[in-house]
């Protein structure tokens, strides 16, 4: 009995007081009940805890996702939930990207970085956008000449200059043919649609012909005229040989006809040696 008393705890566990027990724990770890019997004072160790589920086997020990000393996988913006095929525009002030998803019905959007407005649509009819040097986006009438910035720390007056009301006629597009210069091989625009197909290159300042038809025709005409004048000068010389000794003016007539023949033949040679520029494509 002494040995049993030494193994009992020093402090007894309380039991239900409604049963009339003395609240002491006897040997064996039990308390006396109303009938003199012994009742357990406390549940055994671990009885109040839930048993772990037995349906799931323990996880096998494998290699970790990231080994020690190894860098984690790089972040990809395509896997971010915020990224995707959302429409984006560039801020006109800080060049940051602005998501305009769900805002396409608006005319301007606000940048989340610099808090400035950026237009995503054209201004309403009769209006135009003007950006103040303080980066404030203003909208005013097309005919406005002076506007004031509404920001209290700016209040700047912006002069837009004289504006002539009325629809602006678009500038006519140049019509012509792009050709490759026969001298410097550079491309330039030829806009003179006439029978005289001579063009001066703006790069080398030399004259060439657009196509071979015009210089060939001029060469043939000058050659035939020069040949006719040469025959005329020869016949005139043989026919007036005797009279030339008496009248000195006949020599002047010979010289004039021969000079015309030489000029025509020289001009024919000029047209025959002229460089030709070839057209590339229609500009219009």
Swiss-Prot record:
It comes from the Eukaryota. The modification Phosphoserine is found at residue 169. One of its GO terms (biological process) is lysosome localization. Pfam families: Tmemb_55A. InterPro entries: PtdIns-P2-Ptase (IPR019178). Residues 17-38 have a biased composition (Gly residues). Keywords: Cell membrane, Cytoplasmic vesicle, Endosome, Hydrolase, Lipid metabolism, Lysosome, Membrane, Phosphoprotein, Transmembrane, Transmembrane helix. One of its GO terms (molecular function) is phosphatidylinositol-4,5-bisphosphate 4-phosphatase activity. It is found in: Late endosome membrane; Lysosome membrane; Cytoplasmic vesicle, Phagosome membrane; Cell membrane. GO terms for cellular component: late endosome membrane; lysosomal membrane; phagocytic vesicle membrane; plasma membrane. A motif (CX5R motif) lies at residues 140-146. Its EC number is 3.1.3.78. Residues 1-81 are annotated as: Disordered. Interacts (via transmembrane domain) with ATP6V0D1. Interacts with LAMTOR1, RRAGA and RRAGC. This is Type 1 phosphatidylinositol 4,5-bisphosphate 4-phosphatase. It comes from Macaca fascicularis.
């Amino acid at each position: 009995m002494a040995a049993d008393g030494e193994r009992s705890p020093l402090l007894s566990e309380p039991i239900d007081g409604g049963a009339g027990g003395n609240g002491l724990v006897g040997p064996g770890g039990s308390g006396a009940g109303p009938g003199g019997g012994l009742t357990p004072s406390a549940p055994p160790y671990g009885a109040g805890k839930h048993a772990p589920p037995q349906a799931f086997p323990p996880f096998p020990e494998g290699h970790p996702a990231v080994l020690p000393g190894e860098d984690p996988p790089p972040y990809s913006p395509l896997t971010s939930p915020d990224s995707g095929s959302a429409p984006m525009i560039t801020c006109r002030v800080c060049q940051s990207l602005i998501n305009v998803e769900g805002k396409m019905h608006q005319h301007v959007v606000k940048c989340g970085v610099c808090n400035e407005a950026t237009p995503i649509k054209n201004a309403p009819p009769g209006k135009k956008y003007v950006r103040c040097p303080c980066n404030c986006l203003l909208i005013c009438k097309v005919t406005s000449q002076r506007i004031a910035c509404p920001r209290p720390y700016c209040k700047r007056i912006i002069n837009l200059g004289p504006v002539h009301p009325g629809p602006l006629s678009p500038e006519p597009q140049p019509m012509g043919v792009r050709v490759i210069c026969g001298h410097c091989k550079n491309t330039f625009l030829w806009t003179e649609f006439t029978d005289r197909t001579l063009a001066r290159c703006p790069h080398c300042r030399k004259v060439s012909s657009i196509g071979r038809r015009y210089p060939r025709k001029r060469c043939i005409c000058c050659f035939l005229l020069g040949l006719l004048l040469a025959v005329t000068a020869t016949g005139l010389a043989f026919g007036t040989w005797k009279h030339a000794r008496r009248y000195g003016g006949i020599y002047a007539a010979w010289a004039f006809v021969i000079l015309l023949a030489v000029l025509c033949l020289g001009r024919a040679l000029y047209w025959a040696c002229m460089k030709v520029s070839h057209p590339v494509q229609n500009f219009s």
